A protein has these predicted regions:
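Amphipathic alpha-helical repeat scaffolds of TPR domains
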Residues: 53-74, 102-123, 150-164
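N-terminal secretory signal peptides that target proteins for export/translocation
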Residues: 1-14
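Short coil/turn connectors between adjacent alpha-helices in alpha-solenoid helical repeat scaffolds
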Residues: 34-38, 71-84, 119-132, 163-174
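Structural marker of alpha-solenoid helical repeat scaffolds
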Residues: 52, 97-101, 145
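Bacterial N-terminal signal peptides
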Residues: 16-29
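Immediate post-signal-peptide N-terminus of mature secreted/exported proteins
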Residues: 33-61
Length: 175
Protein backbone atom coordinates (compact mmCIF):
# COMPACT_ATOMS: atom_id res chain seq x y z
CA UNK A 1 0.00 0.00 0.00
CA UNK A 2 2.80 2.41 0.84
CA UNK A 3 4.53 1.60 -2.45
CA UNK A 4 1.33 2.41 -4.37
CA UNK A 5 1.08 5.77 -2.63
CA UNK A 6 4.78 6.42 -3.29
CA UNK A 7 4.36 5.58 -6.98
CA UNK A 8 1.30 7.84 -7.29
CA UNK A 9 3.10 10.66 -5.49
CA UNK A 10 6.20 10.19 -7.65
CA UNK A 11 4.03 10.32 -10.77
CA UNK A 12 2.39 13.59 -9.68
CA UNK A 13 5.75 15.12 -8.77
CA UNK A 14 7.20 13.96 -12.08
CA UNK A 15 4.35 15.54 -14.05
CA UNK A 16 4.66 18.79 -12.12
CA UNK A 17 8.42 18.88 -12.73
CA UNK A 18 7.91 18.23 -16.43
CA UNK A 19 5.32 21.02 -16.59
CA UNK A 20 7.69 23.37 -14.77
CA UNK A 21 10.56 22.50 -17.14
CA UNK A 22 8.34 23.08 -20.18
CA UNK A 23 7.16 26.41 -18.76
CA UNK A 24 10.74 27.57 -18.13
CA UNK A 25 11.82 26.47 -21.62
CA UNK A 26 8.88 28.32 -23.17
CA UNK A 27 9.73 31.49 -21.28
CA UNK A 28 13.40 31.26 -22.29
CA UNK A 29 12.44 30.71 -25.91
CA UNK A 30 10.05 33.66 -25.85
CA UNK A 31 12.72 35.87 -24.25
CA UNK A 32 15.28 34.83 -26.88
CA UNK A 33 12.86 35.74 -29.67
CA UNK A 34 12.08 39.10 -28.13
CA UNK A 35 15.69 39.99 -27.32
CA UNK A 36 16.96 39.95 -30.91
CA UNK A 37 18.16 43.49 -31.60
CA UNK A 38 16.48 45.32 -34.45
CA UNK A 39 18.46 46.62 -37.40
CA UNK A 40 18.18 50.14 -35.98
CA UNK A 41 19.53 48.97 -32.61
CA UNK A 42 22.44 47.20 -34.31
CA UNK A 43 23.17 50.30 -36.39
CA UNK A 44 23.07 52.53 -33.30
CA UNK A 45 25.54 50.23 -31.54
CA UNK A 46 27.90 50.38 -34.52
CA UNK A 47 27.57 54.17 -34.63
CA UNK A 48 28.51 54.35 -30.93
CA UNK A 49 31.51 52.14 -31.67
CA UNK A 50 32.48 54.42 -34.56
CA UNK A 51 32.28 57.45 -32.25
CA UNK A 52 34.70 55.74 -29.86
CA UNK A 53 37.04 54.74 -32.72
CA UNK A 54 36.71 57.51 -35.34
CA UNK A 55 39.87 56.48 -37.23
CA UNK A 56 38.85 52.83 -37.48
CA UNK A 57 37.42 51.48 -40.71
CA UNK A 58 35.73 48.39 -39.25
CA UNK A 59 32.75 50.03 -37.45
CA UNK A 60 32.00 52.03 -40.58
CA UNK A 61 32.42 48.95 -42.77
CA UNK A 62 30.01 46.96 -40.57
CA UNK A 63 27.46 49.80 -40.71
CA UNK A 64 27.54 49.85 -44.50
CA UNK A 65 27.27 46.05 -44.69
CA UNK A 66 24.28 46.11 -42.32
CA UNK A 67 22.52 48.89 -44.25
CA UNK A 68 23.13 47.39 -47.69
CA UNK A 69 22.31 43.87 -46.52
CA UNK A 70 19.00 45.13 -45.18
CA UNK A 71 18.22 46.79 -48.52
CA UNK A 72 19.08 43.62 -50.44
CA UNK A 73 16.92 41.46 -48.17
CA UNK A 74 14.01 43.94 -48.18
CA UNK A 75 14.31 45.90 -51.45
CA UNK A 76 10.70 47.09 -51.44
CA UNK A 77 10.91 48.53 -47.92
CA UNK A 78 9.89 52.16 -47.56
CA UNK A 79 13.27 52.77 -45.91
CA UNK A 80 15.38 51.20 -48.68
CA UNK A 81 16.42 54.50 -50.28
CA UNK A 82 17.14 56.01 -46.87
CA UNK A 83 19.44 53.07 -46.07
CA UNK A 84 21.18 53.33 -49.46
CA UNK A 85 21.81 57.05 -48.88
CA UNK A 86 23.14 56.40 -45.37
CA UNK A 87 25.40 53.62 -46.68
CA UNK A 88 26.79 56.04 -49.28
CA UNK A 89 27.62 58.54 -46.51
CA UNK A 90 29.34 55.79 -44.50
CA UNK A 91 31.36 54.73 -47.56
CA UNK A 92 32.42 58.36 -48.03
CA UNK A 93 33.61 58.47 -44.40
CA UNK A 94 35.74 55.39 -45.11
CA UNK A 95 37.13 57.01 -48.27
CA UNK A 96 38.00 60.12 -46.24
CA UNK A 97 40.31 57.94 -44.12
CA UNK A 98 42.27 57.16 -47.32
CA UNK A 99 42.92 53.48 -46.58
CA UNK A 100 46.36 52.30 -47.73
CA UNK A 101 46.34 48.61 -46.81
CA UNK A 102 45.27 46.31 -49.63
CA UNK A 103 42.77 44.54 -47.35
CA UNK A 104 41.10 47.86 -46.44
CA UNK A 105 40.99 48.99 -50.07
CA UNK A 106 39.52 45.58 -50.95
CA UNK A 107 36.83 46.05 -48.30
CA UNK A 108 36.08 49.51 -49.71
CA UNK A 109 35.77 48.12 -53.25
CA UNK A 110 33.49 45.39 -51.88
CA UNK A 111 31.26 48.06 -50.34
CA UNK A 112 31.10 49.88 -53.67
CA UNK A 113 29.98 46.66 -55.38
CA UNK A 114 27.45 45.99 -52.62
CA UNK A 115 26.19 49.58 -52.91
CA UNK A 116 25.54 49.20 -56.65
CA UNK A 117 23.93 45.82 -56.00
CA UNK A 118 21.56 47.40 -53.47
CA UNK A 119 20.61 50.09 -55.97
CA UNK A 120 19.96 47.42 -58.61
CA UNK A 121 17.75 45.21 -56.42
CA UNK A 122 15.45 48.11 -55.57
CA UNK A 123 14.53 48.43 -59.26
CA UNK A 124 16.24 45.77 -61.41
CA UNK A 125 14.61 46.76 -64.70
CA UNK A 126 15.69 50.38 -64.48
CA UNK A 127 18.90 50.17 -62.43
CA UNK A 128 20.29 46.84 -63.62
CA UNK A 129 21.42 48.03 -67.06
CA UNK A 130 22.72 51.27 -65.56
CA UNK A 131 24.79 49.89 -62.64
CA UNK A 132 25.63 46.23 -63.27
CA UNK A 133 29.05 47.03 -64.79
CA UNK A 134 30.05 49.18 -61.78
CA UNK A 135 29.03 46.39 -59.41
CA UNK A 136 31.00 43.74 -61.32
CA UNK A 137 34.06 46.00 -61.67
CA UNK A 138 33.99 46.82 -57.95
CA UNK A 139 33.83 43.16 -56.93
CA UNK A 140 36.61 42.31 -59.41
CA UNK A 141 38.78 45.10 -57.98
CA UNK A 142 38.11 43.88 -54.43
CA UNK A 143 39.20 40.36 -55.35
CA UNK A 144 42.26 41.63 -57.21
CA UNK A 145 43.35 43.53 -54.08
CA UNK A 146 42.55 40.61 -51.77
CA UNK A 147 41.73 37.26 -53.42
CA UNK A 148 40.71 35.88 -49.99
CA UNK A 149 38.00 38.51 -49.44
CA UNK A 150 35.16 36.14 -48.55
CA UNK A 151 32.43 38.77 -48.60
CA UNK A 152 33.44 39.97 -52.07
CA UNK A 153 33.50 36.37 -53.32
CA UNK A 154 30.05 35.63 -51.89
CA UNK A 155 28.50 38.89 -53.10
CA UNK A 156 29.95 38.47 -56.59
CA UNK A 157 28.56 34.93 -56.77
CA UNK A 158 25.11 36.06 -55.60
CA UNK A 159 25.20 39.01 -57.98
CA UNK A 160 25.92 36.74 -60.93
CA UNK A 161 23.16 34.33 -59.83
CA UNK A 162 20.73 37.24 -59.62
CA UNK A 163 21.71 38.44 -63.08
CA UNK A 164 21.10 34.99 -64.55
CA UNK A 165 17.78 34.69 -62.72
CA UNK A 166 16.63 38.10 -64.00
CA UNK A 167 17.68 37.28 -67.55
CA UNK A 168 15.76 33.99 -67.41
CA UNK A 169 12.59 35.50 -65.91
CA UNK A 170 12.15 38.71 -67.83
CA UNK A 171 11.46 40.04 -71.28
CA UNK A 172 15.12 40.94 -71.62
CA UNK A 173 16.18 41.60 -75.24
CA UNK A 174 19.24 39.33 -74.86
CA UNK A 175 17.05 36.34 -74.12
Amino acid sequence: MTSQISKALASVVSRRMMTLVLLVMSLLSLHAQQSQPTMEQQLAALQRLEAMQPDSIQPKYQQAVLLLGTVCSQPQSSKAQQYIDEAQRVIQRIEALQPTKAADRSDLATLHGFYYTAIIVTNPQQNGPRYYRQALDSFDEALKLNPKNALAQMLLERFKEGMVRNLNHSDHPCK
